[in-house]
Amino acid sequence: FPEEVLKCTTGFGTGMGGSGNVCGAITGSVMAIGLKYGRVDIENDNAKVFEKVNDFITRFNGRYKKQDCSGLTCAWREKGTFKTPERRKFCSAIVGFAASELEKVL
């Protein structure tokens, strides 16, 4: 990826800047879908993007049932063990799953 892409996605981590909101794997995937199918003119239809995003979200929800970082990682948050290798491994698995499903959607 270009350095600019990595820079602009840095804030996605831990549910948007550590806020616990939407999982960065989802947000990054939606960005990738937009990059491929997005419109450049506001007059153009966005139905294809919405279809692809909803397909991806359905796949993600089928596996994880939640979209927010807080909900996905609540076991670690409740125990105060968020910054552990186990939680990082879990999140890496989420990112891997998201990438795999994104590839199918694209």
Residue ranges and their predicted role:
Residues 48-106:
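C-terminal binding/interaction regions
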Residues 30-38, 100-104:
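Short glycine/serine- and small hydrophobic-enriched flexible loop segments
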Residues 17-18, 41, 61:
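Amphipathic alpha-helical interaction elements
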Residues 17-31:
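Conserved phosphate/anionic-ligand binding catalytic regions in large, soluble enzymes, centered on
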Residues 10-17, 36-37, 76:
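Acidic, glycine-rich active-site loops and adjacent beta-strand->loop/helix elements
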Residues 1-11, 69-75:
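Acidic-glycine-rich active-site phosphate/pyrophosphate-binding loop
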Residues 12-20, 83-87:
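A short glycine/serine-rich beta->alpha loop
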Residues 1-8, 33-52:
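Phosphate-handling active-site elements
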